[in-house]
Amino acid sequence: MIVNRYKDAGVDVNAGYELVRRIKGAVASTKRPGYVGNIGGFGGLFDLDSLGYDHPVLVSGTDGVGTKLIIAQKMDKNDTVGIDVVAMCVNDVLAQGAEPLFFLDYIACGHNDPALLASVVQGVAEGCKQAGASLIGGETAEMPDMYAPDEYDLAGFTVGVAEKDRLLSVDTPQAGDVLLGLASSGVHSNGFSLVRKILFKDHDVKLTDKPAELKGKSVGESLLAPTRIYIKSVLPLIKQGLVHGVAHITGGGLIENVPRMFNDGLRAEIAAGSWEVPDIFNYLKQVGNLSDDDCWQTFNMGLGMILAVPADKKEEAKKLLLASGEKVFEVGHLSERTDGEKIFIKLVE
């Protein structure tokens, strides 16, 4: 009787049980050394000693997918936003020099549709596999009246580890370091409030539209390209001492995020035009009549991550990154800063 009354109030615990049944295989596929236990416990367990670190420092990160979820829900395509939420968290801890160990997800919804939410969690599991992290727990909260029946929100939390003497700090990068940019897959998971205003409020763009600028892709397909996860390509370089700094290009674009990886005594000089800008950004700039500053301050503009590497190590770093499947661009360098802003972007024809 209690269960029925709870269902009458809008919460179906049996749907929750069905969701757990559907995701067990996906969760199990993310197991890695150190993972302890199984899905369904009150807490997720991880054995740090099993990894053999000498002086481990734990690095944590949490994030969400933001209003990119509105695009996914309108398109009824929910299988890649889980990759996004993992990427947003694990790329952040990578910027400190850490290896992601485990991940937990949080889904809040107006109505628990087990098939739909299972597709979300399967995306989370795929992101965890790309990052080498175990999905050790999570929470699904069915909250009628808080969310519409067809709405859900998604957030996540990760913990990584680094040797204490391998941590990256703002004092690690040096003047003369070369800046290597790693290609993004598109908009990633930031700037979608501006994207939605441009396309759907200021203009009557449809997600199914295929403008010539996108070369055969629909607007929705281009916007939902999952955030790239850089762990398996960048972490080996960090462990080999080839990287002085990492900037994950998220909200605030290049202008805000590049200066976060070095101290106030340095300045990043970046050559715009030295990398490939994905078509989606040129399309958004044109439709939205955006200035260059609007773009630099909002979007990643084709660079999902920027590494500061010693000049005498750049060719070795490039070779390893290319071998791991990354598109790599030499986009600038660090110099001594006497005054002015910490980042300067100049156009190179």
Curated annotation (Swiss-Prot):
Gene name for this UniProt entry: purM
Family classification: Belongs to the AIR synthase family.
Record-linked PANTHER family: TRIFUNCTIONAL PURINE BIOSYNTHETIC PROTEIN ADENOSINE-3, TRIFUNCTIONAL PURINE BIOSYNTHETIC PROTEIN ADENOSINE-3-RELATED
Pfam families per the UniProt record, alphabetical: AIRS (PF00586), AIRS_C (PF02769)
Domain of life: Bacteria
Keyword Nucleotide-binding attributed: yes
Lineage, uppermost ranks: Bacteria, Bacillati, Bacillota, Bacilli, Lactobacillales
GO biological process: 'de novo' IMP biosynthetic process; adenine biosynthetic process
Catalytic activity reported: 2-formamido-N(1)-(5-O-phospho-beta-D-ribosyl)acetamidine + ATP = 5-amino-1-(5-phospho-beta-D-ribosyl)imidazole + ADP + phosphate + H(+)
GO molecular function, one term: phosphoribosylformylglycinamidine cyclo-ligase activity
Cellular localisation: Cytoplasm
NCBIfam families in UniProt: purM
Pathway assignment: Purine metabolism; IMP biosynthesis via de novo pathway; 5-amino-1-(5-phospho-D-ribosyl)imidazole from N(2)-formyl-N(1)-(5-phospho-D-ribosyl)glycinamide: step 2/2
Enzyme class: ligase
Catalytic activity, EC: 6.3.3.1
InterPro entries for this protein: PurM-like_C_dom, PurM-like_C_sf, PurM-like_N, PurM-like_N_sf, PurM_cligase
GO annotations of cellular component type: cytosol
Entry keywords, A to Z: ATP-binding, Cytoplasm, Ligase, Nucleotide-binding, Purine biosynthesis
The name this protein goes by in its record: Phosphoribosylformylglycinamidine cyclo-ligase
